């Protein structure tokens, strides 16, 4: 049933249209994977893997929420359609400082998504978790969520594509 709940969360993530629903669905899937990572109760290794996964996931969730709050403070919305509409218009001079909030928020949300897929600079948690988890759980949460989060990441990049000139250095750095 935990696996089915995680599959439901992954299916919901593809259909998310704002950052708050994406956060809730990502956390629902992460909670299922925390349980699956520490599924072997008699193994201290498995318990350690689940705990490391939980602590690093809780930290990165706070970063996601902080980034989302900066985006909301700068744009006044978290809906993807409204965000792309607002980003398509140039900001007036008196609102230019809000662009910095939006840029930092976009970077924080992007870092969170890259952390969730264990991309290169943000992959420090994955070897320990994969090593200590049961093999069946490792196969599940090392492949399936990455595909779904990448599909969400494609949607996210299409929303923030208008800011790409301002943050392309970040993408070059992590690439």
PLM features: what roles do these ranges have?
Residues 1-175:
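Alpha-helical transmembrane segments of multi-pass membrane proteins predominantly involved
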